[in-house]
Amino acid sequence: MAKDIKFSEEARRSMLRGVDTLANAVKVTLGPKGRNVVLEKKFGSPLITNDGVTIAKEIELEDAFENMGAKLVAEVASKTNDVAGDGTTTATVLAQAMIREGLKNVTAGANPMGLRKGIEKAVVAAVEELKTISKPIEGKSSIAQVAAISAADEEVGQLIAEAMERVGNDGVITLEESKGFTTELDVVEGMQFDRGYASPYMITDSDKMEAVLDNPYILITDKKISNIQEILPVLEQVVQQGKPLLIIAEDVEGEALATLVVNKLRGTFNVVAVKAPGFGDRRKAMLEDIAILTGGEVITEELGRDLKSATVESLGRAGKVVVTKENTTVVEGVGSTEQIEARIGQIRAQLEETTSEFDREKLQERLAKLVGGVAVIKVGAATETELKERKLRIEDALNSTRAAVEEGIVAGGGTSLMNVYTKVASIVAEGDEATGINIVLRALEEPVRQIAINAGLEGSVVVERLKGEKVGVGFNAATGEWVNMLETGIVDPAKVTRSALQNAASVAAMFLTTEAVVADKPEPNAPAMPDMGGMGMGGMGGMM
């Protein structure tokens, strides 16, 4: 396919049009008075959102060169979302400002490589200063403030703070769509996995259709049990102890299952069998997790153990086990704290090394189950459109809160970027490098300016006043007052602000050093079918 090539100024100008188109659509959502953007969906109702990355991903431009510019800025939003989970609109606004200012200087004859050096120096200084001024997040109320600012909803802030308090900072918090109008929190304590009882005859509570075992022994194996003789020795030992038994195996079937059910119904002993969770290597890892949590052993031929050799000592123990049709929850496992801590350390090390998003999610789940539980926020709304929008906001708030716990908080509303202004301005540089630093200085003002504009105010007036205020004091666009942002609870996670700045600078530097752009030439439209004129049936009469 033939290619279309543009060089230097012409190339950068074409791409800038794409940058502006995307950024202008995204930046209207910034701040407490930001507006929403409606996205058309081919099926179902349109999506109404104020989430920068969701809007950026939807934008596709007809002109290939403009589209490349738009995709570059979409990359800034996407990367910031991957690293920090929020701050995508701020990143887009910063990238647009740096690209715009940089292009003015390149057009005026500045050397792009010199500008790039200056931009990189300025960002390093800004990030260092952000680390200095960030404050660690402490207590439930601080967590609630971060979440409430991100979601623009105090109720959501309280829910997320409560969820994090209940399951800990490493706990898994998931979002589900609720059937009702209200948003609720549901916390599952202990280790839960998605496997239910092998037979409904094993239930102990017919009203709730669940089996509850108090202080049970837990037999953990990766084998299939089809012959009762295999587990008879250990079964007899458990019956002598007068305790219930939970069997976690690859499968329990045939004669073995029938014998267990008959004895359960006769009241000889209380036993529940469930299938082992997961598949393949993940199943082995999860069984090992359960064994460590309950102080038992995984009975597997890989370790030279068979079921006949199992004793009460090789079984796990727990305070309580609840088994429903679909889930099994093990509460208060009696495993040793040292072994559990070692296992947690092992999973954390794997988390740092993995590059797969799926593996990371599964490792995070395993970690949460060992640490203390899973919280589910059930999102409710009156309509499907509102539900989708609300779910996106809560997702952002959740990511924002996790980022705050990791690296602390800074003054919100773009104030922290203005607080590092003096440090960046003090960098000694000359020529194009100094111009690069000035480009970043101009960009640091942009989020505050845009928040003010979205609130219907004159952005430049707010920016100039902010330069004269002391660190931490900023403009609350929601009320129109000048306040101490940290004390008022208007805060941003330092990680979100840092990621937005670094990703914006990275793409802006690449953009300014672009000298040629290559795109596919649009294919000419196929000619329309020629008009058949008088070739109707009547005109063909002579051919009959």
From Swiss-Prot:
Q: Does the keyword ATP-binding apply?
A: yes
Catalytic activity annotation: ATP + H2O + a folded polypeptide = ADP + phosphate + an unfolded polypeptide
**Protein's GO biological process:** protein refolding
- EC? 5.6.1.7
Q: Where in the cell is it found?
A: Cytoplasm
Cite a single GO MF annotation.
ATP binding
State where ATP binds: 29-32, 86-90, 413, 476-478, 492
- Keyword ATP-binding part of the UniProt annotation: yes
Q: What does this protein do?
A: Together with its co-chaperonin GroES, plays an essential role in assisting protein folding. The GroEL-GroES system forms a nano-cage that allows encapsulation of the non-native substrate proteins and provides a physical environment optimized to promote and accelerate protein folding.
**UniProt cross-references to PANTHER family, sorted A to Z:** 60 KDA HEAT SHOCK PROTEIN, MITOCHONDRIAL
Describe the protein's quaternary organization and the partners it interacts with. Forms a cylinder of 14 subunits composed of two heptameric rings stacked back-to-back. Interacts with the co-chaperonin GroES.
Query: Which HAMAP family does this one have?
Result: CH60
Q: Which NCBIfam families match?
A: GroEL, PRK00013.1, PRK12849.1, PRK12850.1, PRK12851.1
Q: Which family does it belong to?
A: Belongs to the chaperonin (HSP60) family.
Report the protein name in the record.
Chaperonin GroEL
User: What is the source species?
Assistant: Bacillus anthracis
